[in-house]
Amino acid sequence: MATRKAAKTKANGPAHVPSGPSQVLAVVYGTLLLVYLRFIFSAGITHDPAKVMTQALPGLLLLHMGYCVVVLGNKPGRKIGTDVSTAMIAAALSVFFSVIIFGLLVLFGAPAISLVHNTFVCAMHMSILAVLPLFFTYHLDSKVWADIIAMRRPLDHVYAASVCTLIGAWLGAIPIPYDWDRPWQQWPITILAGAYLGYFVGTLGGIALELTKSLCSKTKKTE
């Protein structure tokens, strides 16, 4: 009975429980993404959102793949070539998944005709941020993905960052309808910013939750 319970707990837990150094690197990387977002704004996103977001895609993709290989794939005895291959597959799947996110954006009110390029490129940014690390960490395990979609998966910082990326993008849409006549209110600049900020907040929140669980577990063992 105890063996079955332990096996069930392991199956429902995160695929990769990060060590202290990995958690620190995850926070550093989240901060780096905020710097990258600042770079996107300084590149003139308010003048030509579609062009600047498109030009920023390769950099984001390389950054996220590197993060997956160096931080999320940092496991003893695992070859880096395996992690690189997994990251490439995850990247391809995230690009494909951007079509679904594009559909969701349109469903929630995104311009379906006039600003298709803007919407689709924004969907690609969101998919790379939210989906690529999930595919890298959890692969194509149907049971795990059923738990992720149903929000039954225990939160680690990878899952939390993905969820908060989508929440941040949703919250980012709030300023757009207001009649403030600000350049940054163009579609979908605030949604893009919300996604990046959400990723950072989710990473911090997920790590805080991991540390809390670890501390509680150690406390119970000492009692």
Curated annotation (Swiss-Prot):
Family according to the record: Belongs to the PIGF family.
GO cellular component, one term: endoplasmic reticulum membrane
Membrane topology according to the record: Multi-pass membrane protein
Segments crossing the lipid bilayer: 25-45, 52-72, 88-108, 120-140, 158-178, 189-209
Pfam families the UniProt entry points to: PIG-F
The protein, known as: Glycosylphosphatidylinositol anchor biosynthesis protein 11
Places the protein is found: Endoplasmic reticulum membrane
UniProt pathway annotation: Glycolipid biosynthesis; glycosylphosphatidylinositol-anchor biosynthesis
Xref: InterPro entries: GPI_biosynthesis_protein_Pig-F
GO terms, biological process: GPI anchor biosynthetic process
Protein keywords: Endoplasmic reticulum, GPI-anchor biosynthesis, Membrane, Transmembrane, Transmembrane helix
GO molecular function: mannose-ethanolamine phosphotransferase activity
Primary location: endoplasmic reticulum
Source species: Yarrowia lipolytica (strain CLIB 122 / E 150)
Its biological purpose: Acts in the GPI biosynthetic pathway between GlcNAc-PI synthesis and GPI transfer to protein.
